[in-house]
């Protein structure tokens, strides 16, 4: 019996234009009216996760930052955050800066960007929830030290040939993943969407075997491997499809709505 559905955001809940469709909202509302929890599990920062959870009509608990944080959109409380250890965090930042990479540096409740990244991200992330918490600084490392900010995640995009992946992989206490075929995400070792979902589901009193997960990317694999009913989107990577028990249509075909309805049919059994 499915009692909780965990949804990835980009490539899953959001359509190709970056919107939550009316069909997706209707499916979420129907699931919640049937007593099934529906939660977001995203690589996006906490403020954006909150915004989309409200926009879609999801339950208040969210997994954000690729499993790096668990928070409550109803209260604004950050329940748990898993930060990158030092000195690996500083070393990783120094490796990534000044390479013409579009960087998002998630530090506390702020998103740090250098001027190069800000220009690019204005086009990539038009959402007010993102830019309201964005800080542009010439020296992110010095800014973090000055304000005593922890580092939770680094996201790099737009210039794969410049990514220092080999050097980052050699740093202790860190792990690399991705949310599409042209980016990278750096988090603390052991941090992933499955681990965060395990804590979230425990808070709701629901075992993982009674949970479903819906996703499309490499960073969704731990979530899909953790739940009893893993569902891949039609636009998912081949490894994600291989980990799923069934495949929904793509995010351009309201696949997430159909995935939710399939869970409701299973929940009624």
Residue spans for each PLM region:
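Active-site phosphate-binding/coordination module
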Residues: 19-124
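Mg2+-dependent phosphoryl-transfer enzymes with acidic/Ser/Thr/Gly-rich catalytic loops
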Residues: 1-4, 20-21, 33, 185-269
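Structural motif corresponding to alpha-helix initiation and N-cap regions
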Residues: 25, 46, 86-89, 137, ...
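Asp-based phosphoryl-transfer active-site loop
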Residues: 3-17
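Short active-site oxyanion
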Residues: 35-39, 59-60, 152-154, 209-210, ...
